Amino acid sequence: SDDSKVVATGYGRVAVDFADHVITEITCHARGGREMAGDECAIIDVGGQDTKIILVSGGMVQDFQMNDKCSAGTGKFLEIMANRLGVTLQELFDMADKGTVLPISSLCTVFAESEVINYIGEGQKREDIAAGVVDSVANKVAQLAMKKNLPETVILTGGLSNSTYFTKILSQKLGQTVSPTE
């Protein structure tokens, strides 16, 4: 017999009308965190649409925090900025690793993009612009995470967990090791 089931989660979960179960993204992250790291951990999920900090204690969701509806602290922001620089997301991280941070002070994607355009117009090094862009997202994620009392084990999920550079920068900002998912 086939014991397989379909579970839908995330923003598109309501569109999967054939799902056997619908489970919130936060609950799924907590279950994954528990499997990876045990009953006490924090999950930082930097997705395309939002950023979530999920605290797991006793194997259950203890608390969570989401960013506001602005995309400036998300993967989408980095995609937009990489596109503006004419590079892929991976190339953006590679460039950032070689650059010196140029500050991106705007909290809004549209205004931050204007800052990037101005830097390009000034002839600033693309590596420095890339470093500023990645640093900006890491700052926003760290500020959200530091609103919570993070346990020793912190896991990074979402597309940015594929970037060793972003993981390194976020770890520095939090003052503790952040482990990417495998």
Where are the language model's segments positioned?
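Conserved phosphate-binding loops in N-terminal lobes of ATP-dependent enzymes
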Residues: 1-7, 50-52, 81
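Glycine-rich phosphate-binding loops at beta-strand->alpha-helix junctions
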Residues: 11-12, 150-173, 181-182
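Conserved phosphate-binding catalytic cores of ATP/NTP-utilizing and phosphoryl-transfer enzymes
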Residues: 12-44, 49, 54-59, 142, ...
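Conserved phosphate-binding/catalytic loops in two-lobed NTP-binding clefts
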Residues: 19, 23-27, 170-182
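Glycine-rich phosphate-binding/hydrolytic loop that grips phosphoryl groups
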Residues: 31, 75-79, 179-182
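Glycine-rich phosphate-binding loop plus the immediately following alpha-helix
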Residues: 58-104, 108
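Short, surface-exposed connector motifs at secondary-structure boundaries
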Residues: 60, 125, 146-153, 173-178
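Adenine-nucleotide phosphate-binding core of ATP-dependent small-molecule kinases
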Residues: 112-146, 150
